[in-house]
């Protein structure tokens, strides 16, 4: 049976076009960042487009990808076997991924544009042509969990090898998991087999990670797993920085501190327009400020990049489609929500400074008395990052509250300080000060619920 399945799959694995070839991605030798194969920094700015393959037609997919490319996204996260009944509800062209939903053999027909996988090929090609990598989930977690499981280790290995061969030359990252906890040895056997199949199929061309359930990280389940190249977290859909150590954003920091090191990022943070903590009647829906806080909290705690999400876009919600958890608008209307634009601008900030030597720096923030003021708690948590060679430091102030910073981490006697406005991507109020000792800073909107980033650059760097 295994050989028969494998023969069918490998014969059908025609391979996606290599047009728009992107450089391969690799882990930086020091273990905390990703880079391209020629050694350039890679900033992961992802978008959760979970239902992209399943729900959009080609024209809609191009519209979506054009928008994300314009805003500076470098990754879109999409699922081959989608959560929202992806094995029984066809895609926009009436095609299903498998001929039999209980038998995971891809349904492939000869000729172009004749099956589900031709549509996936098209979207992957169009993403790559726009400089966007696809973080491809072979399956949502629903399809390897308990009652809905359709895989055995043998069929998972065959499916993985087929996918690996088909997308070997494409610009992508494999994402295992799919929003579910890894709880049993049987589940682990399926995922191990799927990963091994992917590796055989693509020859090790692509990195692999694991998208966990809410509030967890891949390190919780796969901390020492040899096929995990970098860790992914789902810090989830609440808007606070928890006081409990090791939870959510502190979990990002804990993952950064693991040895041997592996890069870490938040692959599913709080979404824009999402019910806060899944409680819309009590807590309402998130706004762009909530999205910015998650971005800077994760990045300043050691993440190598970040994923954006919008509650209408992950499900590709449109009129006439059943809504999941009260989306506020259609996916088309959500494309230009402020949070997505603001994170695209913030990406430029991180790429404008030395990249591979940036480290978390909670120690440079001088705690107040009481510490609940600074570094603070809840939505008002201050965080910091710095260059380990003293070229720069940054402090994220989520509110207009004065705070103190120890600038002895800066390598030159004088430094340039300025405020970065995360709403506009602009800097203001730049000045030169002495680096030595502790300095107090007052954000431009003191006393207001507006966030700012303090920028500190060594005098030798002096960016315009």
Predicted regions mapped to residue ranges:
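A short, sequence-level motif marking secondary-structure junctions
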Residues: 46-50, 410-411, 434-436
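Sec-dependent signal peptide recognition
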Residues: 1-7
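Active-site mouth of glycoside hydrolases
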Residues: 22, 27-242
